[in-house]
Amino acid sequence: MNYAYDVIVIGAGHAGCEAAAAAARLGSTTLLITMDMNKIAQMSCNPAVGGIAKGQIVREIDALGGQMGIVTDRSSIQFRMLNRSKGPAMWSPRSQADRIRFIAEWRNILENTPNLYMWQDSAVSLTIENGVVKGVKTAFGVEFTAKSVVLTAGTFLNGLMHVGPVQIEGGRVSEPASHGITEQLRDLGFTVQRMKTGTPVRLDERTVDFSKATIQEGDADFHHFSFLPTVKSELKQRPCWIVYTNSEVHQILREGLPESPLYNGQIKSIGPRYCPSIETKLVTFPDKEQHQLFLEPEGENTHEMYLNGFSSSMPWKVQFEALSKIPAFANVQAYRPGYAIEYDFFDPTQLHHNLETKLVKNLFFAGQINGTTGYEEAAGQGLVAGINAHQAVAGGESFVLGRDEAYIGVLIDDLVTKGVDEPYRMFTSRAEHRILLRQDDADRRLTPKGYALGLATQERYDLMRSKWDAVEKLVEFAKEFSVKTSLINPEFERAGFPTLAHGCKLYDLILRPQLSIFLLAEMIPELQKRILELEQARREEIVEAAEISIKYNGYIAREEAIAKKLSRLEHVKIRGKFKYSDIHSLSTEARQKLEKIDPETVGQASRIPGISPSDVNILLLLLGR
């Protein structure tokens, strides 16, 4: 038995799995400690991956050489591309996943990753000497040593669940909470706070009247998260269903509010703004006559279904009575109630951009303990933390992504620069350069970085190069190919499009909003021939990327120029150069915020809430710029 490792990862949730896999694949001997090896990468809440902005993060994880996209594709039971009615910067992939298959796929990957080992136990304390982490002690009394440690404890640190007046210690239903680490880190100067999240009731589909629900099928043109074309789901595809609350449901819930832990003072922590409980919806939107709910399958062959939109900590009798007033649930049976959970998290402004803590060297935090919510946000942090835990051991440079390079970069920069006062969820609106951070080109942006690290394989890198070579050739063909009116006008007349007065380049036709490359291929044999010559497994992906490149070329070029201009401030280092409390030309708020955050660069300083443009100019003047 080995007790000495390069990297130890505490917690095998979505952050921990990515961290452990990354560190081990980069060459560090890695130990993953988890309370239950049968619940690795457990989907604690909804059985889905992706969504608005979250789907882009999963694509970025995959492009870098992470695993979440592969696991999701292999366990997918429904796929949808959200926001297709909007521009491509807003397109967001989302997949329903088989919960059990998701765990099995992750465990298979971890158990077959060289350098990676697992230990089932609970970590109770860290070994820290002279401000440097040296190892981990467990509940079984085992001591492991490590050169770096990644803490990804999720909701388990002093977790407390609520169902009405009933309170149960735990990190998840039927799983114990973790004690000891929070108290140790608080004594070392870490700022510890509490947050709250929740999950809805699980229902038995055999007792649902689907004739009173609206079906929601997945996309027929099935996409995938992974850029590897060989990764596919072999599972049966299943639909979701839509139902609505009504006045009877609302009346029962309102009468039960005095028993709600959220409204009687039992829960004092702040919950996620963008995933409110059903009782919060009623209080916040008292005039709304109904709320939409989604009934989502938990897997390919299970009868268990997740009621998205009905998160609650009300007493079970109130939850059930309200549910039964929804026509589709008149005779419903449940598997378990919804519940709320409070847990500890640490102020993320006490982290560097590589997710190493400022107070303890070689100790990294990732996931919900940094104040985020969501599997995808956790996994993205876990990947970065795992990479940097390895880099700390190997003596390599820290791996940091910029705001113009990845949503993961936006996420981490927001956390360490602005901090959080409520659970942080990623949105496309948080990214000022979102047209540069599309889901379709995550491989072009990030696979070269993953390849340089040694995380993305040669196969992945070659696939990325061949794809974008094909995209560029298709764009060049569009620029060079002349379309004659004698060819296209009869086709346009049949389709009801305005005819051309004179010939033009194919590129100019693709620029038209109502015309797609695939539609034009039906009218132009030479274009059809070009498309059919493309690799079949990636044909749609290549054509889609070429079309986006053409239609949005002007916007993309303009945004790249803006990002390049702003990036100059990211290269002006200021950490350690000033004692901010002595710079009286700065505002009082600016001095306080700069002292607390201790930004790495002027660019980061400019994004701290309360730092004005004049404060930034003062810093630049003091630097002689």
What kind of region is each of these model predictions?
Residues A378-F399:
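Internal hydrophobic alpha-helix adjacent to the cofactor/substrate pocket in enzyme cavities
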Residues D36-N38, K54, T182-F320, I408, ...:
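An anion/pyrophosphate-binding glycine-rich loop and adjacent beta-alpha core
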Residues I10, E143-G154:
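Short hydrophobic core segments
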Residues Y306-T372, V400-D413, R539-K593, D598:
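A glycine-rich dinucleotide-binding beta-alpha-beta segment and adjacent secondary-structure elements
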Residues A4, A21-S125, F140, T152-E169, ...:
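Conserved N-terminal/central alpha/beta ligand/cofactor-binding core
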